[in-house]
Amino acid sequence: MLTINSIKNGIVIDHIQAGHGIKIFKYLGLEEADYRVALIMNAESSKLGKKDIIKIENIMEIDYKVLGFIDPTITIDVIENETIKEKIKLELPKTIENVIKCKNPRCITSIENYIPNEFYLVDEENGEYRCKYCDEIYSGGDINKL
């Protein structure tokens, strides 16, 4: 039997698409953490079938826009004294900056490295973003491109 204790203070990143948990874990640099962290993969879920969960025994700064871009179904639970203080449901952010790079070699961001890569959401249903400078379309949510 698998037992993972509750955390006293920290955050739980829940409802991660199965298989994406390890990539989010690495993106957040949690393999270097000096506090307790649990990555649960392929947990049963009534909504998703299977899901990943990350439990972090520490309050840390996380860019919710990036997590929403990776997977808008993620829920963040902020835990204090072993109870959920706040539940944050993520969604696709309207804009993202320096999360992905424009793939257009003629884009100003490819030529001038000091210009931030900025994208804005153009199709929420398909998760498509458009480069602010050259209008190149990027389909969001592909964690492999981070």
Curated annotation (Swiss-Prot):
Binds 1 zinc ion per subunit. Keywords: Metal-binding, Pyrimidine biosynthesis, Zinc. Zn(2+) binds at residues 102, 107, 131, 134. Its cofactor is Zn(2+). GO terms for cellular component: aspartate carbamoyltransferase complex. GO terms for molecular function: metal ion binding. One of its GO terms (biological process) is 'de novo' pyrimidine nucleobase biosynthetic process. Gene3D superfamilies: Aspartate carbamoyltransferase regulatory subunit, C-terminal domain, Aspartate carbamoyltransferase regulatory subunit, N-terminal domain. The keyword Metal-binding applies. Contains catalytic and regulatory chains. Belongs to the PyrI family. Involved in allosteric regulation of aspartate carbamoyltransferase. This is Aspartate carbamoyltransferase regulatory chain. The gene is pyrI.
